[in-house]
């Protein structure tokens, strides 16, 4: 067996992508539906099925309350931070424990980590199908501006999915890695502008001789393509109410229809000046059914979303300032994320940096490609690349007077370790409470609490005498570890920051076991679907051959074939795999016998009956059904050579 691969996964808000190094080059892997991107959507059906990706998206309108999309906007966050998101989703978001978040469905309650794990399992299976071997290791990307809790939650999702997360890397950094992979001899300063489905990041990097050094990063984890969709949705709801007097925002299935229509309109307005939004039978009143029929122009869309586009300006300016650079110092601006296709976004980028953005990378795939390259570095497949990332936010502790004392400043290269000695604030103080903070504000209360722990057993002494050394250690994943040590006694207390919205080790282990059981059920379900498709293909072929053969076969043979087709269809309805396999063997024999007889008499259709063994065709049928209604467009973003920009 070949050496185990470390795959790269872009776990996106809207879509996810998986890539792997093959023969020294990164390869984006198609999923079982034949698409290179997989919707980050999980659904639970009335039949007890768990659907992931395009299958989940296809049934979202009729099963809105049990279809979870944009889980990434909730991962690692506290319930009080999610009020805006909760207003615009079709499913129910509830409190978990003290401050955590869960999604309530007919199949039970699930954390954002568990939902994300289902998507990661789909990515894992996609890679295993392609490689023909088991995959257990991955590099997973996160927005650069994700805080410690969000990073830890993403890593937990990977564990639940059965993956050993070798590294968490920032999405803009991964994009830069992909862009510069074949430009190792080029020395340049680049800006990566990443506007995805739920988050915005801007990173400034310096590329020199295979070293990718992040100089600064900034962003907004509450801004992305979902917000542009919401702006259109709110406009549709308001316009419809003005026209009819009816508020259509209360019905969950209607909200799901509005969401899909808004997303479609947004995409169309990237290539046309106006779009028609038509939703028949959107609601009804005493006078009868009502239809939504509106025209949205690009000018109106730009007006609705101007504040969202403008929100990306200040992070860009801050990132340039933190890097000690002017816009004119930037050699290339790389655009990442589906939302960068919006013309107003591209125009703003041009205004900020004073140059046309570089469009030589695929904005949907470039992050996963960079993750695969980093996986290649960790696996020893790539040797001439060094990645130096940074921590996006400052870290410190609360000190006397409620002030935040910073130990590690934002944009410090990671991994890093920093210690500082503190003392007691009162005479004979026997314990100190360490309040760990992340943020940029001066007062502790204005920053984010990552955790608290106590160092006890300090010998009685006047205030200011004990020496308490506090050490912050940020690993290569950007995850924080903190320790406090009494230098007088040697007593030490260490913690890995575990958020109030996070998961305990016991909870993670339980979820891992649940996910393993879920994977087994998924495999069984997939085998049943494949058996159905194969048997249905055989039944259809036999039926077609008999109809075309006419009097080339006798009445008894026709009746035998008709009975066998009926038994096959009954087996398909039963969902019993063993019964379907038995029917498949029986119908294959009859099809072969009839085909031989018809062929010997030169009748049409014989070759089809004889050759329809089923498995490949059945798999294709399954894939096609999964792609039903989906517009998979790989070429809507022009890829050009650098010299042809």
From Swiss-Prot:
Record flagged with keyword tRNA processing: no
Record's keyword annotation contains Oxidoreductase: no
InterPro entries, sorted: ATPase_NBD (IPR043129), Chaperone_DnaK (IPR012725), Heat_shock_70_CS (IPR018181), HSP70_C_sf (IPR029048), HSP70_peptide-bd_sf (IPR029047), Hsp_70_fam (IPR013126)
Induction (UniProt): By stress conditions e.g. heat shock.
Modified sites of kind Phosphothreonine: 199
Biased composition annotated in UniProt, kind: Low complexity: 616-629
Pfam families: HSP70
GO molecular function ontology, one term from the record: ATP-dependent protein folding chaperone
Annotated region described as Disordered, given as residue ranges: 602-645
Domain of life: Bacteria
Keywords per UniProt: ATP-binding, Chaperone, Nucleotide-binding, Phosphoprotein, Stress response
HAMAP family: DnaK
Assigned protein family: Belongs to the heat shock protein 70 family.
Function (record text): Acts as a chaperone.
Protein name (database record): Chaperone protein DnaK
UniProt source species: Leptospira borgpetersenii serovar Hardjo-bovis (strain JB197)
Taxonomic classification: Bacteria, Pseudomonadati, Spirochaetota, Spirochaetia, Leptospirales
Gene label: dnaK
């Amino acid at each position: 067996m070949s050496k185990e691969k470390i795959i790269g996964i872009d776990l996106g808000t809207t879509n996810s992508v998986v890539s792997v190094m093959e023969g020294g080059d990164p390869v984006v892997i198609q999923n079982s539906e034949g698409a290179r991107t997989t919707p980050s959507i999980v659904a639970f059906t009335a039949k007890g099925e768990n659907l992931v990706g395009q299958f989940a998206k296809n049934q979202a309108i009729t099963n809105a309350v049990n279809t979870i999309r944009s889980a990434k906007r909730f991962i690692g966050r506290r319930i009080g931070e999610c009020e805006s998101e909760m207003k615009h989703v079709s499913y129910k978001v509830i409190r978990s424990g003290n401050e955590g978040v869960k999604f309530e469905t007919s199949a039970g309650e699930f954390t954002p980590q568990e939902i994300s794990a289902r998507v990661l399992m789909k990515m894992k299976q996609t890679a295993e199908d392609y490689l023909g071997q088991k995959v257990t290791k991955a590099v997973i990307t996160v927005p650069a501006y994700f805080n410690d809790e969000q990073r830890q939650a993403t890593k937990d999702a990977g564990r639940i999915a059965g993956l050993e997360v070798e590294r968490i890397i920032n999405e803009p950094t991964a994009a830069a890695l992909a862009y510069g992979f074949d430009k190792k001899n080029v020395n340049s300063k680049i800006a990566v502008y990443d506007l995805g489905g739920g988050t915005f990041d801007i990173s400034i990097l310096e590329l020199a001789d295979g070293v990718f050094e992040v100089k600064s990063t900034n962003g907004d984890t509450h801004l992305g393509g979902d917000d542009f969709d919401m702006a259109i949705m709110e406009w549709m709801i308001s316009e419809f109410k003005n026209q009819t007097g009816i508020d259509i925002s209360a019905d969950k299935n209607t909200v799901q229809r509005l969401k899909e229509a808004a997303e479609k309109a947004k995409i169309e307005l990237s290539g046309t000046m106006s779009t028609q939004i038509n939703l028949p039978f959107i609601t009804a009143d005493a006078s009868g059914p009502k239809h939504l029929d509106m025209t949205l122009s690009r000018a109106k869309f730009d007006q609705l979303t101007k504040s969202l586009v403008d929100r990306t300006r200040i992070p860009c300016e801050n990132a340039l300032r933190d890097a000690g650079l002017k816009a004119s110092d930037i050699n290339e601006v790389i655009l990442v994320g589906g939302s960068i296709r919006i013309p107003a976004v591209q125009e703003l980028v041009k205004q900020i940096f004073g140059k046309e953005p570089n469009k030589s990378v695929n904005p949907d795939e470039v992050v996963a490609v960079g993750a695969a390259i980093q996986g290649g570095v960790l696996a020893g497949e790539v040797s001439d690349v060094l990645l130096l990332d940074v921590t996006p936010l400052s870290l410190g502790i609360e000190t006397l007077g409620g002030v935040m004392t910073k130990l590690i400043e934002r944009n410090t290269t990671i991994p890093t370790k920093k210690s500082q000695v503190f003392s007691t604030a009162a005479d004979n103080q026997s314990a100190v409470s360490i309040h760990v903070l992340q943020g940029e504000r001066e007062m502790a209360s204005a920053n984010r609490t990552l955790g608290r722990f106590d160092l006890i057993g300090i010998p009685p002494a006047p205030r200011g005498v004990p020496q308490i050394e506090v050490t912050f250690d940020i690993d290569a994943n950007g995850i924080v570890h903190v320790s406090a040590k009494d230098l007088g006694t040697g007593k030490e207390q260490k913690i890995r920051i575990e958020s109030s919205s996070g998961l305990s080790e016991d909870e993670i282990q339980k979820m891992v076991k649940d996910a393993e059981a879920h994977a087994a059920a998924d495999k069984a379900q997939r085998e049943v679907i494949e058996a159905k498709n194969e048997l249905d293909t055989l039944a259809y072929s036999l039926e077609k051959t008999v109809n075309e053969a006419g009097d080339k076969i006798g009445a008894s043979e026709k009746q035998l074939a008709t009975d066998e087709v009926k038994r096959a269809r009954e087996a398909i309805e039963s969902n019993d795999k063993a019964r379907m396999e038995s029917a498949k063997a029986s119908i294959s024999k009859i099809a072969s016998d009839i085909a031989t007889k018809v062929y010997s008499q030169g009748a049409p259709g014989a070759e089809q009956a004889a050759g329809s063994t089923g498995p490949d065709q059945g798999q294709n049928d399954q894939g096609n059904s999964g792609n039903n209604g989906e517009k998979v467009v790989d070429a809507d973003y022009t890829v050009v050579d650098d010299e042809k920009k």
